[in-house]
Each structure stands twice: as C-alpha cells, then as structure tokens.
Amino acid sequence: MASTLPTTWPHESVKFEDVSLTFTEEEWAQLDFQQKCLYREIMMENYSNMISVEHHFSKPNVISQLEKAEDCWPMQREIPQDTLPECSWPSPDPGMNSFPSKSPLMKIEVVEVLTLNKDVAGPRNALIQSLYPEDLNPGNLKPAQQPSKRLTDTEASRQKFRHFQYEESAGPQKAMSQLRKLCHQWLQPNTRSKKQILELLVLEQFLNALPEKFRVWVESQHPEDCKAVVALLENMTSVSKDDASLACSSEATDQLKEKRKGVATLPVTFAAEVPAEEPVTFQDVAVDFNEEEWRLLGPTQKTEYHDVMLETLGNLVSVGWEPTLGNRELTPDSPIPVVKPIHDPNTNDLSRNGTQSTVFESILEDGVKEMHSIESNQVGNLQEKGHPQKKFSESSKSQDQTSRHKSQGSLNEVLPRKYVKVKQKGTGKRKGRTNTISMTRGLRIRKQQKDSVEWQGRSGSTPVTHGSSIKKQQQGSEQGKPGTSRDPITLTVPAKVYQKATGSEESIFMDSSDAMVPDVPPKIHQKGPEWHKVGESNNSMLQGSSVQNHQMESGAGRASDNSLLTHALPVKSHQKGYKEGNVQGNRNSWKHIKPHQKGSKGERVEELSTSEKHVPYVKNHLKTSERGKDREINASIKCDPYIKTYYRGSDVGRLRRANNCRKAFSLHAQQISFIKIHKGSQVCRCSECGKLFRNARYFSVHKKIHTGERPYMCMACGKAFVQSSSLTQHLRIHSGERPFECSECGRTFNDRSAISQHLRTHTGAKPYHCERCGKAFRQSSHLTRHERTHTGERPYVCIKCGKAFTQSSHLIGHQKTHGIKFKKQPKL
C-alpha cells in the first residue's frame, strides 16, 4: 500500500491529497468487504470536512469512483439480486437457493433488507414493500411511526440534544451514553442516509441564522427540508411586497378622493417623521384620548398615563421647551381661552387612584393658563417691612374664588407628584404611596432668608373648594412698584388632610427662579414670638393657616415682618404659663390642636418664627406611649435618638437631620436609611475580603464562605451546603423532581434560574453585552469570562507551579498533572 503523506507541513493550505490514501489494484483486491467499506467511509468523511472549511476544488476521481460503486456494494452483504436489478452480477449458484420462493425464511431475508439496509436500498423500498401489502396496514404501525407525529418527535429530540446538560451526579459515562442516545433519536442514522443527515444540520443552522420575525413563523410551519424553508420565505416576501403596494395604492386613492371633494388634507406626521432640523414639540410625543376612550380606562391606567405624560412634559421643559397653546407661545398678556376641566365627583383629593379624568391637552392648557395668568389673579400680597396690611375687598375675594374654581382638577394633572407629600386622613390607614406635587422637575421647594412667607388658608362660611391654584405674590408698595427681592410663588394645595369634617387649604411657597436647587440645610434664624388678636369669628379653624387667613379677611392683625415661616396656634385666653418659644398642651400629635372657640373674644395667637426648612406633612414623631401626660416642646430643636425627628417652636414645622453629620432630609424614608448607615446596621464590611453588604442576612451567608461552615447537609449523599435553598435544589437531584417546565419544548428543570437561561435559547435574547467589542451573551458568567480576554485577568492560580488560568475548569485539568484532586481555588 502506497500512502502519500507529506514529510513536512508547509504553510500552504491543506489539500485533499494530503489526507487521502490510494491503493493499487493488487492491494485493493486483497481487502475484504468490511475494509473496503471502512475505507470508503473515511474518504467520504475527509472530503466532507474539506468542503465544510470552504476548500473549493474539483471532486477527486477517487471520490467519484466510490460514489459510483456505492449502489453495487450491497450485493456483497447478501442482498438478493432481484432487489437491485440495475446492477449486473453473476447468477447465484442454484444449490445455494435451497428454499422455495414462498418459504417464510425468504420473507425474513427481505424484512432484514427493509430494516437494516434502508440507507443503501432506500430507492427500492417502495418496490419491495409492494410485494407485502399486508405489512403496510396503517393499523399495524406504531404510534411513534405515524407521519403526523414524526416532525414533532424529531424537533423534540433535537431540542433535547442541543440543550443537554451534564449532571455531576450521573457520571461522565452515563452522561455520554445519554447524549449519544439523544443524537441517535434526532438524526436516526439507521433510517437516514448521510445526505439526509447533512440536510438536517444545514436546515438547523439556516433557521438559527434567520431574523427573529422570520424564524418564529417558519418554525411554526414545521418544514421538512431546506427547499421547504426557501419556498416559505419566498412566499412571505412576495406577500409582503403585494401588501405594501396595495397599501400605497389605497392611500393614493383616498388622497385623490379627498382632493376631489375639496377637503384640504394634511399629511399625518408622527414623532419619528419630524425632521431633524425642527424642534420636537409636545404634540409629537403626546398621546390623547377622547371622553369615551377615557371612560374605558381603569384607575391604574389613568395613573400610568398621568405619570408618563407629566414626565414627558418635564423632560421637554428641562431641555428648554416652552409650553404653547394652539402652536402659539403664551405670554402673561396673551388672552387665554377658558377650558373647563372634566371633574370626577368621586375624586376630590390628590389620591393615587383618584386622578382627574381629563385629556392631557386640556390639562396642559389649564396648567399653562394658571402659570401665565398669575399676575392678573393676585390676592393676598405680602407687604414689605413697615407697610400696613392691605385688606381684602369683595372683588378680590370673588376673583380668588373664581380662579380657584377654574383651576380645580387641572393643576393636579399638571404638577408632577414630587417633593411635597400630602398625607390623607379619614380611613385610618396609611396610603401605600404618598401623593406629591411640584411645578416641574426644575421647581423645588425652597425658602429664601429674606423672602416674606406666610401660611394662607380659607375658613369661612363658604365651603372650601378642593382644587389647586397658583398665585404669584409680588414684593412692592401699594402702587405696584417692583420690589427688590425675588417673587415667591404661593402653591395652594387643598385636601382632606387633617380632619374628616373640616377642610383646609395650605400654601407652600416656592421660588420660581430656583430650578434644580440642591437641598441644602438653611441657616437657622430664631426670633421672638409676636402676639396678634383675632376678632369675633363663627369659624372652627383647625390649623394656624386658617387663623392667619381669617385675620387677613377680617382685617385684624398684621403679617409678620421678616418671618420666613409664620404659624398661628389657637390658644385659650384663660390659659397661662406660655413662654417665649414654648408651647404647652396635652396632645399626642401636631394634628390634635384644639379648634378656635366660637364666639371667643380677645384670644391671643402665638406666632413662632424660624427659618428651618419646613416639611408640612410628616409622620408623627412622638407615639402615644405617654398619653395623658403633658409634654413641653422647647423652641430649640429636639431629637429622639431613634426616630430622628426634630421639633421646632411648634408641632407643625419639623426638620429631619442626622445627628452626627448634620445632613437634613425632607423625606422620612431617606432619613431613616441614612441613619441606619451611620449606626452601622445597614452596611456590613467583611474583614476577610473587604466586601460590603447592605443586608445583614447576605453578610451572614457570606461569612460562612470564609469559615467553611456548611450547616445544611444532605442525608442521602452527605453533601453540605451554606444555604437551605441550595440544599432544597440539591434534593431534587435525588428525588428526580423537575418542577420547572419549558412551554416551548417541554423540557423540565430543577432550578428556576436554569429555565430562565433556557428560555433565552428560544427567544434569542442576549441581555449581557461587552462594552468593548459589543458582543452579546445569554449568561452573565459568559460575559465575565469573555471580558477576561480584554483585561488579561487570570484569577485561578495553581498552588504548585503558580500558573494562572481564566477558567476554573482549566485549573482543575491542570491540577491533574500534579496529582492534585478536584479542588477549586478561590478567586484572588
């Protein structure tokens, strides 16, 4: 036998002659049948491998000869000559055929041809099976052999083979046999030829390369071969082209009809069609509903629509977009049409589930109208120091009520729910999510040291309007001259907050020029109290803001001169013992303040001034553990060391401040979280590796890694685990329980994370992307392993020779060379 093997391997590409073997005629005659078959299989496999690596060359002569001789070789396997009449063979010896033609043994020999040699005698099977029609009865076929289930079984076998996972408990030998069995179930080499198997592999790769929208549809049709896939794709492409042309023709026809009717049609433009050189307007990104569609929406959908549209408005305002109405920019002097908002009688406050049902276009118009009509609706102007208080006239009060009614329900939609909390009372339960309002993202609550601010409310014989309004208070004289300081904005937020029967309105003052101002603790200015008298009143006022507003309406009293925050508390005239800055009373919370007594005269109101940041709606600091006892709240700030809530001169104004870093908070949740960090109970640092944990439970689990503690042990195999969940997952291996099943292919898993990773093979999702090269991965561990190729990191080091590896499996294989047993090394 002469073999042409190269002695040296050049740098040129490998040729077929380099991997082929040739025989002379004498050597070929000495080979038996099995050796010839083995030679043919090896040569054909080498030829297929050369083609698969894109080596383009003409078919060698030896391959052509082997393919021609394929049909004649089965005769040497004792197949009768009449099964392959096209091959010319010498007639067999008559003595060898000692059985009659109708003998059962002859039928057995034919059955062997059908079952064992289908890959060779496939084209002749139809002719042979026609000789035995009784064996082809559909009732004799097994259910697995039915044609309707053949494609489904093939696809299921392919999925099982592709997604096979090695289980350590099964062992390598058993796992290999299972994988080989799955491969046989899918490819079926006993019943398919090599060409058919190759067709299956090409079909699978082609389907994986298709786009997602094509692949899902093609797989649903269950194509048998590549030709069927190509036909399906061509039909789908032609149908899509026909639909596109039909849509274009119908659109052109509609436009022609409209032109004939004389109707001026405008092209419909979407946000994606806005030219790049034109600025994006709110109408390009807004979604509108009519009244009928709005009624069909549920409370949750309305709330989501409310939040999305307000966030969009805030984003546009933050990048410099100015609100407009009717494509016309609004100015304070421009006339604005009155748009009556749609009210829901069941929702009167700023509850989460009670969003006013208005289309956003009217919401925007009402909000912008209030923003630009502030100067025309001035009421309750704050006076400069030294000027007497201006009395309200009947016209100003009626104008105030009109503006409140017009803005009712509109500002609730315009103002995003941020920065100001509104705590509601009446159900006795705490709301799941507090309602907050703000002008936009760039409008923060802030008090300036030199701006005069006071709390305003409404308490009178007329009912309180549960709406919202914005009023601009100007500094200056009575003649309307502008003042020197900036103009604060009074934001009135009425709601049923403090009592069920008595409603009240409160005002929060915000500086419109302070956009996106960080929350900085203001300086503290202490000032002595001032006393004012309140005239006769038949009103029951719950809050100091109601008392102050009552003073302004009746003309009694005067506003504070330089107070940044004015709060009036009703005090009985016969009570004594009040000191400067102190408030004594038997109460459990700031809400339980005795109302203003009817018909009382000469009662004094204590006015306490401070410049601390005011948070009007907060949780009660002191619980009812000392109910019935008198408490004295000093003017200086007090702090409970555990709840961290500070008091000022009254129960209303509270400031939250961390005691060891002097950082102020306006939100209770932020303050509690911050204090936990200071106390050390929220952040835990591992002394071994330096890792930080915000959860003590995770930290306790992490410590067991260093100590080697494994308290949860399997009673079946003795394996121990750090967490109980790991033991539960391990026990499913012994019990065989696989509770998680894939709805696509029917495969089951014993772990939730395993099925979530498996589902990505169906959806094609690759959520983990490399920031350097953009390559995507289905699992985070694959991304971590890939990133080491960029960084050069090798965290797994051999303790014997110091060689480093990127994967733990490589280290385990390397340790075998040193005679070390399987033992993973920790990451450095």
From Swiss-Prot:
Domain KRAB: 14-85, 280-370
Position of the Glycyl lysine isopeptide (Lys-Gly) (interchain with G-Cter in ubiquitin) cross-link: 15
Region span, Disordered: 328-355, 377-490, 575-611
Subcellular location: Cytoplasm; Nucleus
UniProt xrefs under Pfam families: KRAB, SCAN, zf-C2H2
Function summary: Transcription regulator involved in NGFR/p75(NTR)-mediated apoptosis. Essential component of the NGFR/p75(NTR) apoptotic pathway: upon ligand-binding and subsequent cleavage of NGFR/p75(NTR), binds to the intracellular domain (ICD) cleavage product of NGFR/p75(NTR), translocates to the nucleus and induces apoptosis, possibly by regulating expression of key regulators of apoptosis. Induces NGFR/p75(NTR)-mediated apoptosis in retina and sympathetic neurons. May also regulate expression of neuronal cholesterol biosynthesis genes.
Record-given protein name: Neurotrophin receptor-interacting factor 1
